[in-house]
């Protein structure tokens, strides 16, 4: 018979259950927001670049459909210059102009709307490059000190609500641009991604971007 330390078992179960509480709350918040109002905003403000349902057909503009509510909400807030600050946490001239006019409710509603849309994923066009990206995504690169991407974003790139964004099915052009921005410091709102991206070679960035575009 295997003997168990009840205190250890209870502690593990408590941590396990506790880890789901933020996710449940965020899902509840997404549905408590007014997605219909978000849809109206999306059609008026966002459709030209991201499409009305968030499935952008412009490779340099991200697909927003199916992205986590919490991630979308955070990014829209990062594009705003908050009181007491002289710049936005995430600098982008176009998004600064749009996000600056959004209220807190607008951000909630837009985030809820896009998170509830079904993604029409992009695709990999270079299979050999995608295979090279898969190796980095799943195993990382010990020599360069790069952890596996799947350890945070999951084996299918779906992320974890409230912690890590969905990255599968995203346009390769946008993903490569994002990783490059983290690498050169022009996007500085995530210290963890800046540290990891700084170790990626240009070839690894392009390979990862290609792999993620076709990951389902």
PLM feature segments, named:
Residues 26-42, 55-60, 116-142:
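Electrostatic cytochrome c docking/interface patches
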Residues 57-64, 79-125, 161-166, 184-216:
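Axial heme c-ligation environment in periplasmic c-type cytochrome domains
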Residues 33-82:
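The feature marks the first
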Residues 46-52, 110, 146-155, 208:
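The canonical Cys-X-X-Cys-His
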Residues 11-26:
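Bacterial N-terminal signal peptides
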Residues 1-14:
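N-terminal secretory signal peptides that target proteins for export/translocation
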């Amino acid at each position: 018979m295997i003997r168990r330390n009840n205190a250890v078992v209870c502690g593990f179960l408590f941590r396990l259950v506790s880890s789901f509480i933020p996710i449940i709350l965020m899902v509840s918040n997404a549905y408590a927001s007014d997605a219909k109002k978000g849809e109206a905003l999306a059609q008026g403000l966002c459709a030209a670049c991201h499409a009305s349902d968030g499935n952008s057909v412009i490779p340099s503009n991200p697909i927003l459909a199916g992205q986590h509510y919490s991630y979308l909400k955070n990014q829209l807030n990062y594009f705003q210059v908050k009181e007491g600050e002289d710049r936005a946490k995430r600098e982008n001239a176009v998004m600064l102009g749009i996000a600056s006019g959004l209220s807190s409710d607008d951000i909630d509603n837009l985030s809820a709307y896009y998170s509830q849309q079904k993604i029409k994923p992009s695709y990999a066009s270079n299979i050999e490059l995608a295979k090279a990206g898969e190796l980095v995504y799943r195993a990382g690169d010990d020599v360069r000190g790069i952890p596996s991407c799947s350890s945070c974003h999951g084996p299918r790139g779906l992320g974890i609500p409230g912690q890590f964004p969905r990255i599968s099915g995203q346009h390769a052009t946008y993903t490569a641009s994002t990783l490059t921005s983290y690498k050169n410091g022009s996007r500085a709102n995530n210290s963890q991604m800046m540290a990891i991206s700084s170790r990626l070679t240009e070839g690894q960035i392009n390979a990862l971007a290609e792999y993620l575009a076709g990951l389902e």
